[in-house]
C-alpha cells in the first residue's frame, strides 16, 4: 500500500516486488532516500495542534508535521515520512497515511495546495473528494475517529536540535543508532510500528553480517523548551 519511487522497502529489509510510480501498494513507508526539496538548516519549532496528537511547524513554508515519533510532509499530492527532521524521506502510500495525519485541519497546512481553496479551515481536507471514490471506500472511516480516544502526543525528539549543519547524520544507520540512544518512545500506529521494526531488523542484520565477515577473515502550546 506504498507508492514507491525507486524504493526497495522499509529500510531495505522487507524484500518484495516493487510497484511502479503510478501504483498504490500498501505496505508502509518506503526506504528513506527520497529528496523532496526541503532542506532545514536546524531543528524546527514545533507547536501542538489543539485536540490532535500532532505538531506542526508554524515558521516553515511547508506542510510539516510530527506524529507518533515521525515527521510527516505533504508535498505535490504525496505524503512523506522520516524519523529525522531533515530526512531522508520515505514515500507513504495514500492507503497507509495515518488517520490522525489525514484529520489535521486545513489551517495548519502552511503551504496548502490550490485544491484546498474553499475548504473549511477548521476541518480536515476533503481527501475523498480529491483522491476519489476508490480511496474513500478503502478509508471510509478516516474522518470518524473519536478525538476523546486519541493517544497522547508523542514526546518531541528534542535531542535532534543538537544535530544541525555538518553534524546532521546523513546515513540512515547512523540516525537509527543515535535514535536508539536518545529516544525511547514506542509508536502505536501500525504503519509507524512497522517502520520502527524494520529499522531494528536492519540494524540486527547489519551486525550479523559484520560478525560473519569478521569470522571469515578472522496554535497550541509550544513544546520546544
What are the residue ranges of the model-derived segments?
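Low-complexity segments
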Residues: 23-192
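Classical secretory targeting signals
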Residues: 1-22, 183-225
